[in-house]
């Protein structure tokens, strides 16, 4: 059973009134949009409670389609009678001829990637991993029962709430499947498919062995380009005819091969994520995208020391055959039964009073004033920037190098 939400289900989302809100700062810029920390300057009841506003320009048919889908997913999560505490809700949304904008609760703890790298040794202890993975499992389980495959699980997309619990974010790459309770394989639509002939050509190029990955902490790259043919994407039409979605170090073998994929891709990504939390690096990272994909297809994850319940969980999640992967038959129920989660009260996860990390409150930033989001958007449109986009949701003030964890 999934944990009960800490508050009753919200009412249907409202229309976002950009005239009544001001942005306090930019939380992050990405390839598809900008995220602002904002507050309501009109309503006294909400002016002290900041929220995040994501603004996505309608620059292409692809961005328009993904923005609409993300808003739709958030809307479904918000009106769900069994709202999940580890998934966001849509506060309000707005559409203009130039852009989409929507508001979600602000997560003051930043993302899991920043938190992981701030640790002295760059890794989490087993108890901390258990805490975060348990909540992520519940979030994925909820999405899967709704018929949604997440398909973009990575530390950067796991936000830390003020309470210390997690929230998944960014649903533009998710996919609705037809049979939520008994997942079946499907063939991706033309935008997401890898040409099978090129996939076979790529398979002939890879060698049967892979070098040991001794690289340091990663900086993820989105695998939204064709790994076989490096031709530039045509953004004029908004179509990417030979592409697939995900982040290269987290992409599952069946996606690389161009096979149909289902909910099992999320359990594979959970295995990669858990490995990274344990060792500070992903298990298949290579010196290039091609080598990374070769490792995903051919290499087995390497573990230090003796096998234990945690490594058993990771091994089962990183089975390359999706039909034998942990979670492929009964979903999250199979994962919850493993010895690593022995003693976990799945229905009481939100009742843990002291999560491993509790963000410092930044109430000092919640002052009157701010800037107009629309004016900032117009400046971005008219002023080209040579600087690369900064990672989303990684505010530098969130946590410091020696922020301690509270074990539970």
UniProtKB/Swiss-Prot annotation:
Tissue expression: Expressed in the epidermis and cortex of the transition zone of the root apex. Expressed in rosette leaves, stems, flowers and siliques.
InterPro entries hit by this protein: AGC-kinase_C, Kinase-like_dom_sf, Prot_kinase_dom, Protein_kinase_ATP_BS, Ser/Thr_kinase_AS
GO molecular function: ATP binding; kinase activity; protein serine kinase activity; protein serine/threonine kinase activity
Keyword Kinase included in the entry's annotation: yes
GO cellular component term, pick one: nucleus
Catalytic reaction list: L-seryl-[protein] + ATP = O-phospho-L-seryl-[protein] + ADP + H(+); L-threonyl-[protein] + ATP = O-phospho-L-threonyl-[protein] + ADP + H(+)
Annotated SMART domains: S_TKc
EC number(s) on file: 2.7.11.1
Domain AGC-kinase C-terminal stretches: 342-408
Active-site residues, as the UniProt record annotates them: 152 (proton acceptor)
Gene3D superfamilies per the UniProt record, alphabetical: Phosphorylase Kinase, domain 1, Transferase(Phosphotransferase) domain 1
Localization terms from the record: Cytoplasm; Nucleus
Superkingdom to which the source organism belongs: Eukaryota
Positions contributing to ATP binding: 27-35, 54
NAD recorded as keyword: no
Effect of disrupting the coding gene: No visible phenotype under normal growth conditions, but the double mutants ucn-2 and ucnl-5 are embryonic lethal.
Keywords: ATP-binding, Cytoplasm, Kinase, Nucleotide-binding, Nucleus, Phosphoprotein, Serine/threonine-protein kinase, Transferase
Domain named Protein kinase: residues: 21-341
Physiological role: Regulates planar ovule integument development.
Family under the similarity heading: Belongs to the protein kinase superfamily. AGC Ser/Thr protein kinase family.
Protein name, entry field: Serine/threonine-protein kinase UCNL
Phylogenetic placement of the source organism: Eukaryota, Viridiplantae, Streptophyta, Embryophyta, Tracheophyta
């Amino acid at each position: 059973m999934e944990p009960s939400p800490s508050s009753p289900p919200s009412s249907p989302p409202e229309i976002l009134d950009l005239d009544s809100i001001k942005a306090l700062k930019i939380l992050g810029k990405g390839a598809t949009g900008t995220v602002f920390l904002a507050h309501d300057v009109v309503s006294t009841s909400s002016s002290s409670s900041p929220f995040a506003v994501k603004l996505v320009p309608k620059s292409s048919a692809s961005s328009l389609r993904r923005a609409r889908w993300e808003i739709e997913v958030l809307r479904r999560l918000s009106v769900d009678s069994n709202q999940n505490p580890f998934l966001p809700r849509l506060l309000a949304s707005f559409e203009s001829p130039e852009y989409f904008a929507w508001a979600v609760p602000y997560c003051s703890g930043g993302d899991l990637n920043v938190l992981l790298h701030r640790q002295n040794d760059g890794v989490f202890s087993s108890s901390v991993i258990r805490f975060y993975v348990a909540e992520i499992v519940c979030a994925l389980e909820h999405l899967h029962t709704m018929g949604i495959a997440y398909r973009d699980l990575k530390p950067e997309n796991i936000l830390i709430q003020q309470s210390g619990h997690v929230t998944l974010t960014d649903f533009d790459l998710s996919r609705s499947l037809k049979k939520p309770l008994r997942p079946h394989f499907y063939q991706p639509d033309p935008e997401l498919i890898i040409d099978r002939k090129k996939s076979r050509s790529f398979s002939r190029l890879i060698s049967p062995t892979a070098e040991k990955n001794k690289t340091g902490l990663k900086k993820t790259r989105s695998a939204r380009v064709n790994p076989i043919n490096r031709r530039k994407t045509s953004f004029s039409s908004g179509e990417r005819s030979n592409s697939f979605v995900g982040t290269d170090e987290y992409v599952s073998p069946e996606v690389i091969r161009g096979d149909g994929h289902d909910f099992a891709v999320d359990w594979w990504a959970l295995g990669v994520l858990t490995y990274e939390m344990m060792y500070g690096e992903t298990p298949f990272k290579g010196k290039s995208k091609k080598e990374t994909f070769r490792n995903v297809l051919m290499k087995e994850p390497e573990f230090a020391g003796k096998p234990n319940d945690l490594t058993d969980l990771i091994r089962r999640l990183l089975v390359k055959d999706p039909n034998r992967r942990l979670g492929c038959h009964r979903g999250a129920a199979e994962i919850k039964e493993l010895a690593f989660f022995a003693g976990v009260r799945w229905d009481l996860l939100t009742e843990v009073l002291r999560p491993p990390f509790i963000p410092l409150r930044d109430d000092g930033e919640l002052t009157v004033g701010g800037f107009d989001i629309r004016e900032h958007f117009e400046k971005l449109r008219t002023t080209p920037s040579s600087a690369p986009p900064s990672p989303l949701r990684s505010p530098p003030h969130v946590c410091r190098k020696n922020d301690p964890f509270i074990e539970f």
